Amino acid sequence: MARDFPLERVRNIGIAAHIDAGKTTTTERILFYSGVVHKIGEVHDGAAVTDWMAQERERGITITAAAISTSWQDHRINIIDTPGHVDFTIEVERSMRVLDGVIAVFCAVGGVQPQSETVWRQADRYSVPRMVFVNKMDRTGADFLKVHGQIKDRLKANAVPIQLPIGAEGDLSGIIDLVGNKAYIYKNDLGTDIEEAEIPAEMADEAAEWRATLMETIAETDEALIEKFLETGELSTEELKKGIREGVLKHGLVPMLCGSAFKNKGVQLVLDAVIDYLPAPVDVPPIQGVLPDGKEAVRPSDDKAPFSALAFKVMADPYGKLTFVRMYSGILEKGSYVLNSTKGEKERISRLVVLKADDREEVDALRAGDLGAVLGLKNTTTGDTLCTQDDPIVLETLFIPEPVISVAVEPKTKGDMEKLSKALVSLAEEDPTFRVNTDSETGQTVIAGMGELHLEILVDRMLREFKVEANIGAPQVSYRETIRGSAGGEGKFSRQTGGKGQYGHVVIEMEPGEPGSGFEFVNKIVGGIVPKEYIKPAEQGMRETCESGVIAGYPLIDVRCTLVHGSYHDVDSSEMAFKIAGSMAFKDGVKKCNPVLLEPMMKVEVEVPEDFLGSIIGDLSSRRGQVEGQGVEDGTSKISAKVPLAEMFGYATELRSMTQGRGIFSMEFDNYAEVPRNVAEAIISKNQGN
């Protein structure tokens, strides 16, 4: 079966922004104007197509990245609508990894918000070309050029307006296209009757000024264009389009558009710009990966290249497990067998589907550049590579942040125990930032995630989708342990109880590892003083002790253990004896290496009316917070601070009462930092049951 659209006419794009900028509404309008839906769905009505989970429709926020296919002007556009809430950062992260271009949506009133900066950084991490849509131009206080200034100052982006609004707030009547040097006037509420017109006389000077700025910016990218611009002071529409496209693809330029998705103004022009300026799969660098021999390789976006794809999302579904894939090269056919090269396992492709939110269309094949979903994969999880068995490759995977908050969870009735464990396994498969552990001492099941809302929604899903009622404990901070010094450690396990005894003996050197390295084991045993078969058990003993911690029972991170010496007994030594000896040596070493406790620090942004500034700063300081910046804009004070997560539980309620309900805040994980000695002592003492 041939392709519906040539690769040059495919666009894989994401719609991303902070909460309430209007991402989902923008996506809904795109689907309406491109004919996928025939009725406009509103987020606040709970009718949005891309918000297909019950919780999304109730809360009016997007939680999971819904993937939808549509077409516009003979181009295939695959769209991913991403969540704006920081607790769902993994959803944004995984969509950025598989996209070729992004529409960043900003609110014309709120401008650049803390979460916008997070999303922008994620797009930077994966070098995703982008354009900006300044939405909500119909709202009171809307200011397109103020947002332009904020994007340049805060995001350090070369943002260039290619449109201007005609009117603003309640008087938004149309849009000036600076590239084509004309105006579009909206004649009806649905935004389907649009008149192409001359630029209104009262805006002619402003439009000419911004068009000159646009031409100058484009001319600077090309010597031939500079000469023409200096001679004639003019560039053609085609030259401008070509220059903008090249600037976007090289990450040197971010075109800015404007409108109001809710009032149906400007959305068709956004679709035109997606086709004109955002890349096709063939325009972005080929995906990189590693071959079985360790050499780096690339896979070009081409149906004729060997098949390779990345699983970027796994979802439980009434019909079985859905694995979303981004096709990078080759063709994937229904009924074929492929290799999961990340895990080294064979998988069968039972069915292939293309999604339109919760509607789906079965297809016989997916091709290079496609976004689709596979049914029937047994062992594939987020970030795994699928490829042909004859030409294996492992593609670059996703950046997955560590969870920072945990709660104990137990079923309300004994009979729900099995249902609870099934639900937790299923949810953890879908979401790599959601972890499930069993506390070895208490036997409690502990779930960990990126924030209170994240865990709240997962518990809610257990009830709705898996019919499991659960009791939830109070949120707990996910502390970590580490070492600051270096020392030796020794563990000797010797037991004689009649008959065969037990004997294992290891000596290690311990030192801090690189940040982010976790636990690192180095074997420097020579001459067989510790036989080969006992080295792995010794390492296992160290690794398990590392996971359960030494000073307060929290995982130990960034430590390197080098096995340097030891001894064994011909008869009495066993794998278990060396595992215990490894654990003993590890504990001995940690105690001599100045162990410390680490806690998650959160980047907190608070916005309050000016009158409350002093009390908010005082409150943050009392929470062991460090204020890193503050400013006032239009009577609103903005404070940015770093505060330990342990001090932030219940902050939303506190902030409401301190500001009479007029303060808002956002919070995201920043880094792990050492806990002050007096606080650490209290935590250690509590955990040791003193």
UniProtKB/Swiss-Prot annotation:
Domain tr-type G: 8-282
Species name: Parasynechococcus marenigrum (strain WH8102)
CDD domains: EF-G (cd01886), EFG_III (cd16262), EFG_mtEFG1_IV (cd01434), EFG_mtEFG_C (cd03713), EFG_mtEFG_II (cd04088)
PROSITE patterns noted in UniProt: G_TR_1, G_TR_2
Keyword field contains Mitochondrion: no
Name recorded for this polypeptide: Elongation factor G
GO BP term (any one): ribosome disassembly
HAMAP family (UniProt xref): EF_G_EF_2_B
GO MF entries: GTP binding; GTPase activity; translation elongation factor activity
UniProt-listed PANTHER family: RIBOSOME-RELEASING FACTOR 2, MITOCHONDRIAL, TRANSLATION ELONGATION FACTOR G-RELATED
A GO term from the CC aspect: cytoplasm
Protein's cellular compartments: Cytoplasm
Binding site for GTP: 17-24, 81-85, 135-138
